[in-house]
Amino acid sequence: LIKEVVIDEAQDYNKLQYHIIKNIFLRSNFTILGDVNQTINPYYKYQSLNELKEIFTEDCRYLELCKTYRSSQEIIEYTNKILGLNHIQAIRKKNNHPVVFRTEENLKEQLLTDIMALKKNNKSVAIITKNDVEASMIYELLKEDLENISLLNTNSEKFNRDMVIIPSYTAKGLEFDSVII
């Protein structure tokens, strides 16, 4: 008999999967952890994990944690603006402000300049792209100038953490000193 089931990254499971899990572990208690803003599957559209109360009805409590220890205050303020939130607080001290630029012209030169500047003060730098195709394109653009750069995609077995290009859906759980999106 399994008494306690812990599910992490709850936002990456759909409601059918939760019904199946609940029916497999009929006599178990559940602890379900997640963040709807970190979903990697665009088809799972939870407004809140509180929606899971429909499935886990017995003695169900919903708690929302509003402090983060991972990201700096500037990153949290920036993402709060994008997500329309204002209740998430950063515990980590101030760091550099996010820098936003949009460019297709001189993309290679801009990326090389930014990577070199970031590498001066940071051990690891990641370029996070929308998908494998975009990651491969950026890798092809930079590989001759940056011999230590690696491409991490769904087929990769290992990668160089110091300088990596990675699609967003494979970046989950990884941490880098600096990130270019």
Identify what each model region corresponds to.
Residues 4, 11-181:
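Conserved helicase motor core of SF1/SF2 NTP-dependent helicases
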